[in-house]
Amino acid sequence: MGFPGVWMTESESLVYRVVPKCACSTIGQIMYYSDHGTYFDGDIHDSTQGLHKWGQDDSQKVIEAAVLDRRGITFTCVRNPYARLLSSFFDKIAGIQRNGRRYRGNLVPQLMQKYGIEVGSPEDNFDFDQIRSFRRFLLFARDTIRWRRPMDPDIHWSAMSGHISTFITNGGRYDQIFFTETFNDGMQKVLDAAETPVRVDVGAVPRFNESEGHGPKRAHKVSEYFDDLSRHLIWEIYKRDFQLFRYDFDDPDNKMPTGDIDLAEVHAKLGR
């Protein structure tokens, strides 16, 4: 099985299990900078050198050895499930991707046909009923996760606990898991614990939000997108995420965690 979704610095000082829609672009750029003293020119997801990635064949043995030998600081980052799913919708479904196309080719037309989702377009300034379309997208996301139809779950809206668990079940252990909502503090603690070739001041790092500006802005507060049925579906899909990572299910507008993550509990419950 190995360690899919893992990025590692060439110095082996930092090992990161990527969780999509949880600041992964910024984290990847910080890792790159911590080795090279400069940021990658472009989207870090497109890099093929300067940063080990499990998806690169020549990186797999290096990553596996470092993880199993417990070299470097191993970490990941999580985000409020309500906010993460909304971000996935506005970026991947309603937005235009960096290449000027819709995400996954015919996915959006398929959702328009089968689920009645509307997303607008740049020509009409993305004018559509955001709440109605998001709730229909949520039904689609639930169908992919529960029944794997009309397609397998996408990494951008499948549960964080699922991403994080593969690393544990295949023999890895996390040193730190921090919150997107307190990103600077959490990322700095990771860097302070690591021996990186280049020191990084997280407060001075620009934010590398690769999806910014390519789609509509969220027009309503978070809670307005989630009626009783929507919240029932969210609990069905993300129950473990709320519980393990201490997010407030009862108040969608409270994006902040309600407590600290218990790493021992995470390893015990996700390592089964």
State what each model feature region is.
Residues 1-272:
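Membrane-interface amphipathic segments in extracytoplasmic regions
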